[in-house]
C-alpha cells in the first residue's frame, strides 16, 4: 500500500524527522488558508498522486502570490496527472500539498528497503539527491552508501556517523543526520514498511537538514496490525480491478496481453503464463484464486477478468487437491452463465475427479472448451483468440 507525500510527511514528523511546514488542501479555499498560516511569501504546490515524475508533468509548482496559488490550485484539483509512471489516463488529483519554500544548499538521498539477499533492512544514502536512485545505481553505483541493519539492535549511532562522514556532512549536520537516520530505521520497522525514500533530503543554506519529499510503501501483508496506516489508503489511486480482487482475497495483477488467466496457486499461475507465451500468446493478467476455488470466488474472478476490454479469451487452470474437480467444473459453468461470458473459455482440470469434471464441461452447451493438459490448454486458447 502506498501513501501520499503529505501522509508520509505526517509520519516523518511523528518520528521526529524534520519536514517543511505545510498542510494538505482539497479545494482552493483550503489552499489559501494554509498559505496564510505559513511564514514564507512563496509557496510550493504539489499534486498528491501515487506516482513519481510529478515535477516534469506539471504537478509541482512554485507560486509567489495568493492569486497565483488560487489559479494553480484550481488548475490541479479535479484533473488527472499523467507522468512516466502512470498509464495514459493518469492519476486523479483530489488533493494538493501547500508548503513553505526553503533555501537549498545541497540535495542528498536517504532511503530504506527490505533486501532479499541479506534478509535485512538496508538503508541507502547518496550525495546524488533529487535524481532517481535507479539511475544513480546504474551510472555511478559508487555514490551509493549502504548500511545493513541488524534486526536485533536496529540502526546504531556509529553507522549513522559513518554514513554522515561519507556524505560530507560536518559538525551539527552529523548530529542532525544521526537523529534522522535512527528515526527512519525505527519507523521502517514499527510501521512494517517495504520501501521508504527521502529524495531529496536537503541541506538548507542555514545548515539544517529537511525531508523535502517522501515516499512510503507499506507491506500489504502487515496491514492487519497497522490499523492507523490502513485508514490512510486512497483507493482512488489504485486499479479498480485490483481493489475488487483484494476484497475477495484474490491475487490479481493486470498485464498487457489478451488472454485472461485464472489459476489456483501462484507457482502454477506463473507457469501457466509462461506456457501461454511459449505458444505465441500474451497473458492479460496474473490471477491466483488460492485454495478456496468456490463458485462465488470463481464468479468474481471471471467478472474481474472480463472487465478488462483487452481480454479476448480466458484460460482456467485448476489443480483439484482437496477440492474435487467436478465441483469446480460446476462452479465454472455457473459462473460463466452468471457473468454471461461471450469470449472463449478453455479449462484445464487436473487432480481429484478431473475426468468427471472434463465430462461436465464437454456436455455443457456453453462456449467452454475442456483441455487435456496445460500445453493443450495453451494451444487451444491461443488458437481461439487468434480467430
From Swiss-Prot:
Domain ATP-grasp: 9-244
Entry GO terms, CC: cytosol; succinate-CoA ligase complex
Positions with a binding annotation for substrate: 264, 321-323
EC assignment: 6.2.1.5
Catalysed reaction, written as an equation: succinate + ATP + CoA = succinyl-CoA + ADP + phosphate; GTP + succinate + CoA = succinyl-CoA + GDP + phosphate
One example of a Gene Ontology biological process annotation: succinyl-CoA metabolic process
Top EC class, one word: ligase
Keyword list, A-Z: ATP-binding, Ligase, Magnesium, Metal-binding, Nucleotide-binding, Tricarboxylic acid cycle
SUPFAM superfamilies cross-referenced by the UniProt entry: Glutathione synthetase ATP-binding domain-like, Succinyl-CoA synthetase domains
Keyword Ligase among record annotations: yes
Classification via Gene3D superfamilies: ATP-grasp fold, A domain, ATP-grasp fold, B domain, Succinyl-CoA synthetase domains
NCBIfam families for this protein: PRK00696.1, sucCoAbeta
Functional note: Succinyl-CoA synthetase functions in the citric acid cycle (TCA), coupling the hydrolysis of succinyl-CoA to the synthesis of either ATP or GTP and thus represents the only step of substrate-level phosphorylation in the TCA. The beta subunit provides nucleotide specificity of the enzyme and binds the substrate succinate, while the binding sites for coenzyme A and phosphate are found in the alpha subunit.
Subunit annotation: Heterotetramer of two alpha and two beta subunits.
Family listed: Belongs to the succinate/malate CoA ligase beta subunit family.
Protein name: Succinate--CoA ligase [ADP-forming] subunit beta
